[in-house]
């Protein structure tokens, strides 16, 4: 019916508000009360918005393709808008999958692509458990770089991590200064949302084109994503 988009919008927005009010806010408060900080990948199902990242101490993303919409820039944009100097990203999860194929240079390249998107802390994926009795090269998770002492290049891991440490530290010292804001059509996503696909983040992959992002980058500009919540909060 003609009213269906409005009904879907109200339903999706209610889900988003419940995620903010009943999940993100109380867990962040609990973490602070217990002397720690809540790090969260604030996307997926049900549908948090970009500004939902403001409710956690440490937003985290994933996705190395800096010329596309990614959860990485989703998280870093919110961190810039809401003054959070530490924003992390899950890295190397699918790097030359299966395991053992990635080299230290491969790891550096992917890390740099996250730094380009505004990340200031890397969460390496991963270090799978391997029992002592397992034959070499031990157990490995199918989807990740193997960051453990079964890897033949493990001896140079300190050199890799020192580079990543220095870059992460330096990126936290400055102030983000992107010239372009790309408005995320979250309201349109709400109006089209259905129970089997209730994710704002997934919807943005379809609504924010690679061509748009490429145009901005090729013109020499940096950018952040924004949403209605960030504008209302005065972050833009």
Language-model regions: role of each:
Residues 1-236:
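Carbohydrate-binding surfaces of carbohydrate-active enzymes
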